[in-house]
Regions:
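A short, surface-exposed loop/turn module that caps and links secondary-structure elements
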Residues: 31-56
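Enriched for short, Lys/Arg-rich terminal
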Residues: 1-4, 8-23, 58-63, 67-87
Length: 87
């Protein structure tokens, strides 16, 4: 069974999101736990400062950055828009 850990930075950004985005995140988190490569998530590996991390889509603009810490244990490191995360 997969487990998710939340980084403090993720928690701070998540707290600032709208209720609508939080609902979308919860739905996508369920998809992630069922199949992290579900096509709706658009999961892909990252490069540069996020080398070793992956990302999935919550909405068209909001993404979650995460990495697998151990087998089936995932650290959600950050959440935000493309410019917030990658600029």
């Amino acid at each position: 069974m997969k487990s998710i850990l939340l980084h403090k930075h993720f928690e701070k950004r998540y707290a600032k999101l709208s209720k609508k985005i939080k609902v979308a995140f919860k739905e996508r988190k369920i998809l992630f736990l069922e199949n992290m490569y579900n096509p709706l998530l658009g999961t892909h590996a990252l490069h540069g400062k996020y080398k070793g991390y992956q990302s999935f889509n919550v909405t068209g603009d909001i993404r979650v950055v995460y990495k697998e810490e151990e087998k089936d244990i995932f650290l959600f490191a950050d959440i935000g828009t493309h410019p917030e995360l990658y600029s």
